[in-house]
């Protein structure tokens, strides 16, 4: 009977027992159940080695973060207190017209500032890196710049006899020096050497704000502060004792265009002129930046369209694996 039942079973279901749940096929480990994906039970999840931080660890990290923030705040407060204890004042930030992203220098102010330098500052300070040709197209025409250069006698030579001679200035000449050498400059200014003003705005922290504040910041020394003879109190100058007498005051000169020469106006104009002297490419740099922004506005959409045209087909392409037959 058992042999007959087994024969009938093989006849109906086949030799491998296909169709019976749990029937295992020869040559396969685990039979049909080996093809099923393993299930992640709650017990299996709880046995994972990567668990979240505990409550104590969270509290410790929060405490460390609060301590770090408190230490940083204390350091900033102590640094500010030390800076506030200094007697030197930091210049405020003034609303200059050329501070805008696309704003240019005030060329009318540059012209007035050159007049201030020529009539007031050039008696002590040099500008070794600025020539008369640099003024052309900025604040003077070529004819006006030539006339300014011809007002100055420049030493040239040697001539055919081997001697130096004096000639009228040319556009290629640089601004004349007030002193022949640094020793003569110190001797004429009680031992102080007047700095060159060609790059003074870029060389001082605060730029034109510092120049304006220094020129308008002269005042009487506070009670208890004594200065030796020949020094003046200026809170914006390092050490507060400066050897330069107050160079400007109201009506120190008369502008050619009739602008009232108040102290603040004179300081503003000469600071703008020195700003241009330190960075003559200021307007050109911003003009090129504007052109680059316009070009980028045209190129970015074109680049995006080319990227979409190039990669949209590749991104939507599907790969199918076809096993060899």
Curated annotation (Swiss-Prot):
Binding residue positions for heme c: 121, 124-125, 244
Swiss-Prot/TrEMBL keywords: Electron transport, Heme, Iron, Membrane, Metal-binding, Mitochondrion, Mitochondrion inner membrane, Respiratory chain, Transit peptide, Translocase, Transmembrane, Transmembrane helix, Transport
Targeting presequence: 1-84
Transmembrane regions: 288-308
Membrane topology, Mitochondrial matrix segments: 309-325
Record-linked SUPFAM superfamilies: Cytochrome c, Cytochrome c1 subunit of cytochrome bc1 complex (Ubiquinol-cytochrome c reductase), transmembrane anchor
Pfam families referenced in this protein's UniProt entry, alphabetically: Cytochrom_C1
Reaction it catalyzes: a quinol + 2 Fe(III)-[cytochrome c](out) = a quinone + 2 Fe(II)-[cytochrome c](out) + 2 H(+)(out)
Record topology, Mitochondrial intermembrane segments: 85-287
Cofactor binding remark: Binds 1 heme c group covalently per subunit.
Class in the EC hierarchy, top level: translocase
One Gene Ontology cellular component annotation held by this UniProt entry: mitochondrion
Coiled-coil region: none
A GO MF term: metal ion binding
Cofactor(s) the record lists: heme c
Listed GO biological process terms: cellular respiration; mitochondrial electron transport, ubiquinol to cytochrome c; response to glucagon
Superkingdom of origin organism: Eukaryota
Enzyme nomenclature, EC number: 7.1.1.8
Function: Component of the ubiquinol-cytochrome c oxidoreductase, a multisubunit transmembrane complex that is part of the mitochondrial electron transport chain which drives oxidative phosphorylation.
Listed name of the protein: Cytochrome c1, heme protein, mitochondrial
Lineage of the species this protein comes from: Eukaryota, Metazoa, Chordata, Craniata, Vertebrata
